[in-house]
A protein has these predicted regions:
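Extracellular/periplasmic helix-exit of transmembrane alpha-helices
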Residues: 226-236, 288-324, 394-395
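Extracellular loop-to-transmembrane helix junctions
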Residues: 22-40, 94-124, 133, 334-335, ...
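Hydrophobic, membrane-embedded alpha-helices of multi-pass small-molecule transporters
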Residues: 69-86, 223-231, 239-301, 340-349
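Flexible loop linkers connecting adjacent transmembrane helices
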Residues: 41-67, 90-93, 107, 115-144, ...
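Hydrophobic alpha-helical segments and their helix-loop junctions in multi-pass secondary transporters
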Residues: 160-184, 195-196, 215-241, 425-433, ...
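Membrane-interface loop-to-helix entry segments
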Residues: 26, 30-50, 141, 151, ...
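Helix-loop-helix module between adjacent transmembrane segments
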Residues: 32, 36, 112-128, 132-197, ...
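Membrane-interface "cap" regions at the ends of multi-pass membrane proteins
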Residues: 19, 31-88, 252, 282
């Protein structure tokens, strides 16, 4: 590598404008970073952070789930909790939609995903570390809470099933043949069990920083190589269409990218970290900041995948794209470290997903979790259900794809419930509720339209699906306005 190449790699925006390449990508990176400092700060001030208010980590400390931890550790745990396969595999699939994927990753992260993650964590913190179903029940009603408990636990089981096979396959490709995929599936499941039942600071608090380092190395390494390679990525002024067969941009792209822009799964993870925060002011770097970093990871993988598709075509699975990019771009050692980062992301989402499911069931059943036997009692049926889905995905040729699609839709639907619950909270607290109302309306339209049009849904034609999505969104807006006007009447 020449001195000029190194300088260009360290000055990405200089090279973008110098060579008139990757300008859209570079601008998108800058906007994401600015979004944290500008809009993230506004959201924090709007919420009304109280640095003197005691947090659940202090008032409910139990040494297991409610426990004070250093802010940097909480950030790393939150980042790894939410950064599963979504910002990597989802971004790779989303790259087939062209520069539209950049727009959704950037603006979806800043105005929807990061707001969703931050406020779900802070509302939980203000409610003594309440889980997502409890928050939804308080602000949307007890009937909705019951639906949310079932829906959330289902999503957690899907997360575990989805986030086992792919990392097991990647590890098997790096180890002796006698250590096959099934061996690593058992190892990962065993790790899930240990991480789910032990106190959060014993395994998760110690292992996650190492995993986080690998994931950060992967993202930074690929970013540097992108600016060295200078691929001719599509620019926004060339149009937002795509030459690949990926389906209609709306709603398919908004479901495919999933965690790279907004994810309901994150709202199940934010309360876990809300139970460990020492001060409310740490909420912005932990919740909003982790989502912005995930958006950056998704943007990097979307750009890398675009460069890959231009050179090799799209007839590859997301796992194959990851394996090729890591090994070809970063060399043997760098590729191994990068793949370890990719492996760490889904595994660390899977264990905290199971932990979330355990805590949600414990809250519902009012079962204390200080004894290991009671933790095991709740974990057993969850692991059995996940194992059943995993077996289905292995035995069925399209099993993983089917489970992934249902996971993606359930994931985004969960974000809709979360955004509506937070909107109600903001109205009751007399704060700017439009910051969540607008994303709530948009995502309501997305998930409704998707389930109408998708192969795993009702398989309706596009026009009818758009009409139904629009009608459902207007109905949601009407019900919200009616409820809000009812508050004024009571007052």
């Amino acid at each position: 590598m020449s001195y000029e190449q190194l300088l260009d790699a360290l000055c990405p925006w200089l090279i973008a404008f110098k060579h008139k390449k990757m300008i859209t990508f570079s601008i998108a990176l800058v906007i994401l970073v600015l979004g944290y400092f500008i809009y993230g700060r506004y959201i924090s001030r709007m919420f009304g952070v109280d640095e003197k208010r005691a947090t659940p980590a202090v008032t409910k400390n139990d040494g297991v789930d409610y426990i004070e931890m250093p802010t940097w550790k909480i950030f790393m745990i939150q980042f790894l909790n939410i950064a599963g396969l979504g910002p990597i595999f989802g971004a790779i699939m989303g790259a087939k939609f062209g520069t539209s994927s950049y727009l959704w990753i950037v603006f979806g992260t800043i105005f929807a995903g990061a707001v969703h993650d931050y406020l779900s964590g802070m509302v939980s913190l203000r409610n003594d570390g309440a889980s997502l179903p409890q928050i939804v029940g308080k602000y949307l009603g007890k009937r909705t809470e019951k639906v949310m408990i079932a829906f959330t636990v289902l999503l957690m089981v899907l997360v575990v099933a989805v986030f086992v096979l792919q990392p097991a396959q990647l590890i098997a490709g790096m180890t002796p043949t006698k250590l096959n995929v099934y061996f690593w599936v058992v190892v990962i499941f065993a790790y899930y069990l240990i991480a789910t039942i032990l106190p959060i600071d014993k395994v998760i608090g110690n292992v996650y920083p190492l995993f986080g380092g690998a994931l950060m190395f992967m993202a930074i390494g690929i970013l540097v190589v992108l600016f060295i390679k200078q691929p001719a990525l599509p620019e926004m002024w060339n149009g937002f269409g795509t030459k690949y067969e990926a389906g209609p941009i709306f709603p398919m792209m908004f479901i495919s990218i999933a965690c790279g822009a907004i994810s309901g799964f994150h709202a199940t993870q934010s309360p876990l970290m809300a139970r460990c925060l020492k001060n409310e002011r740490h909420g912005r770097p932990v919740f909003y900041g982790a989502m912005v970093v995930e958006g950056i990871v998704a943007l990097i993988w979307a750009a890398a995948a675009t460069a890959f598709f231009q050179e090799h075509g799209t007839n590859f699975t997301a796992a194959q794209v990851v394996d090729f990019i890591c090994k070809d771009w970063l060399g043997i050692l760098g590729g191994i470290l990068a793949i370890l980062g990719v492996i760490a992301a889904p595994i660390t989402s899977g264990d905290t997903a199971m932990r979330s499911a355990r805590l949600i069931l414990a809250d519902m059943l009012h079962m204390e979790q200080k004894s290991i036997s009671k933790r095991l009692l709740l974990c057993a049926p969850l692991f059995i259900a996940s194992l059943g889905l995993l077996v289905f995905s292995i035995l069925n040729a399209n099993g993983f794809t089917i489970i992934w699609r249902y996971f993606s839709w359930c994931n985004q639907t969960l974000s809709v419930f979360t955004l509506w619950a937070i909107t109600v909270y903001l109205v009751l607290e007399k704060k700017n509720y439009f910051v969540t109302l607008l994303p709530a309306l948009f995502m309501t339209c997305v998930v409704t339209t998707y389930i109408c049009i998708a192969p795993e849904g009702f398989r309706l034609n596009e026009t009818l699906s758009y009409v139904i999505g629009g009608v459902m969104t207007l109905a949601a807006m009407f019900l919200f306005a009616k409820w809000k006007n009812g508050l004024k009447f009571k007052a």
